[in-house]
Amino acid sequence: MPLSTAGVLSSASTASNRSRNRPRYRTKALSSEVDESLFGAIKPLTRSDSPIVLLRDKHAIRKTLTALGLDHKPETIQLITRDMVRELIIPTKDPSGQSLIMSPEEFERIKWASHVLTKEELEAREQAFKKEKEAIVDTVTTRKKIMKQKEMVWRNNRKLSDLEEVAKERAQNLLQRANQLRMEQEEELKDMKKIILNAKCHAIRDAQILEKQLIQKELDAEEKRLDQMMEVERQKSVQRQEELDRKRREERIRGRRHIVEQMEKNQEERSLLAEQREQEKEQMLEYMEKLQEEDLRDLEQRHQQKLKMQAEIKRINDENQRQKAELLAQEKLADQMVMEFTKKKMAREAEFEAEQERIRREKEKEIARLRAMQEKAQDYQAEQDALRAKRNQEVADREWRRKEKENAQKKMETEAKLRKSRLEQVAFKEHTLAVQVQRDRDEFERILRAQREQIEKERLEEEKKATGRLQHANELRRQVRENQQKQVQARIATFDEGRRLKEEAQKRRERIEDIKRKKLEELRATGLPEKYCIEAERKANIPVNTSVN
């Protein structure tokens, strides 16, 4: 930190007193100088400029010594200055090890570094810096004008040489260039720049709108193409399902015919009843196993179809996310289209699942009906056999009854096993479907949650950008107001000059018109469409007879 004025004066007086008390030395050079700051500033040991000792207060030191059990008078030394007599404590070893000695400069540096400026203080400092800079620029400009006026008077009163003529010509060129740059700062030319910039912005905006429309058409065409692909895939899936149902119906019809033929065969061949029953059981087991295998294959096919649809939906979502990332600044409707498309896909998938569930239930009902018919036929056949056996065989052998009982017991056990196996299959299917539905629901919620987080993130970014644009607009308005105030003050200051400035204003207008025409020519030279150039010419109020075609 820099030293205070009092400290510098005190250091200087102390240094002079010490120099008078010291013996004189032989002078080597009268003009030699020594930078005393290299050896450190010499200052009296006042209370404010002395090294800062934490816990240096006498009362605090006494309390500390009392707490440590060392309550005795410390060793001191007397320091006599011109204005006071001070008694300094000779520092000893710190028992606590927590004391710290630092210089005032270091303490002030740490205190200054620990201070955090607020936003208002930063703005105030920036405003003060701008005002100071503007004042310096005004002072320098005024000084330059005075020096130029004096130089012009001096040059007009003397004859110029060839080199001076060349220098004068260069100076005039520089002055002309400076006047041109100054004219660039005029309000009319600023408005002209704004008009040209506005024309360029309109041209760029129209091009962007056209590009946006083309992109929207491409997106619509792509969406229609995807819808057509999904419709074709759906029709193919429906055809495959219809073909599969047709084959299953034919197979069930063949099974029914086989059962009817088997029943007729049983009626014709009563002597082989036991063997035929065993064959029927084996055929029924094979048929049930075949149905189970068909159910498993059907479940696997539905699972594969579902995985394909999910992969297709994921691919479409990834494609939409990529397009959304590329057109984030221009296309906000893309996200809504993706969400609607995803909802439609989910609705179609739900309809497909409902249709598959309905088909499965109808198939189970058909199987249950066939089993009921078979059991009914078997029961009826058993009753007929029993009546016929009762009529034809009055004397029944116990061994035959025992065998019949064993056969009936085996039949019941087999049917019980079949029912148990069927129930286990039904429970397994229901569990598998429930797990798959839960997974689909979790995946849908995850995608929906990610989309909501992305929408919230975009909304926050948009709000941040809007805040930045608002601050920038406020800053521009403030600068415009300051410029307007400066222009008003300049006009008030130049109003008293009267007629002399009238001709200058006329010349200034002519120069401004020339500069406007040149800028308009430069605008046309850039290749901007003629309608924007004509609109810029109309806003700039350039007369038609003087405009450049």
Curated annotation (Swiss-Prot):
InterPro entries, alphabetized: CFAP45, TPH_dom
Protein's GO biological process: cerebrospinal fluid circulation; epithelial cilium movement involved in determination of left/right asymmetry; establishment of left/right asymmetry; flagellated sperm motility; regulation of cilium beat frequency involved in ciliary motility
Chain segments carrying region Disordered: 1-27, 391-416
Any one GO molecular-function label of the UniProt entry: AMP binding
Coiled coil location: 119-232, 259-393
Tissue note: Expressed in trachea multiciliated cells.
Gene Ontology CC annotation, any one: axonemal B tubule inner sheath
Cell compartment(s), UniProt: Cytoplasm, Cytoskeleton, Cilium axoneme; Cytoplasm, Cytoskeleton, Flagellum axoneme; Cell projection, Cilium; Cell projection, Cilium, Flagellum
Subunit and partners: Microtubule inner protein component of sperm flagellar doublet microtubules. Interacts with AK8; dimerization with AK8 may create a cavity at the interface of the dimer that can accommodate AMP. Interacts with CFAP52. Interacts with ENKUR. Directly interacts with DNALI1. Interacts with DNAH11. Interacts with DNAI1.
Similarity-based family: Belongs to the CFAP45 family.
Function text: Microtubule inner protein (MIP) part of the dynein-decorated doublet microtubules (DMTs) in cilia axoneme, which is required for motile cilia beating. It is an AMP-binding protein that may facilitate dynein ATPase-dependent ciliary and flagellar beating via adenine nucleotide homeostasis. May function as a donor of AMP to AK8 and hence promote ADP production.
Full protein name: Cilia- and flagella-associated protein 45
Organism: Bos taurus
Designated gene of the protein: CFAP45
